[in-house]
Amino acid sequence: MRKYKLLFLLIIGVLNASGSSPYISPGIQLGFNTKGNLFLSVQTTFGYVSNSGPQPFGLTLGLRWYKMEEKWERYSYNDLQIWPFIGGVGIGQMRDKDGNKYLRFKTGVGALFYATYDYCKDLEIAKHNFGGIGTLPIYNILGGDYNPL
């Protein structure tokens, strides 16, 4: 366990160099799918951003609820994503309450609030999803000197 802690600290030290930072970004999304179902998502992205290094990337973990007739159906999801400019892409999976997994592709454009589209392969109730999400990125967690302004 000690080796992993030391490796983690070394990685954080390297990532914090030269105007870079790990970050966390909670978000809330509201949208609809092509079948007319409303959905609500909450998510948190854990990522890395740099002025001079690789493009911003992150791991997103979230929950989504689809309004179905008189009930809400819950799904969980995770994505790996890269947001090089004011837009980006991601790939991941959604899971239903029974543990079934669905491949998921996502894209979006904007900053702090952005428009989104995601496609879930084989998910009959919601293959095409459109929405808007508001996020609150918190930079320089665990140190770092990234300044987005």
Where are these regions (language model features)?
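Transmembrane beta-strand segments that form the barrel wall of outer-membrane beta-barrel proteins
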Residues: P22-T34, V42-E69, S76-N78, I86-K97, ...
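Outer-membrane beta-barrel "beta-signal"
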Residues: V42, K127-L149
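Glycine- and small hydrophobic-rich membrane-insertion segments that are intrinsically disordered
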Residues: P84-G87, A111-Y114, P137-L142
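Cleavable N-terminal export/targeting peptides
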Residues: M1-S21, Y146-L149
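Outer-membrane beta-barrel architecture
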Residues: Q43-G47, Y77-Q81, K106-G108, G131-T135
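Short, surface-exposed coil-to-beta transition loops
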Residues: E73-Y77, G99-R104, K127
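Acidic, glycine-rich flexible loop segments
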Residues: M94-G110
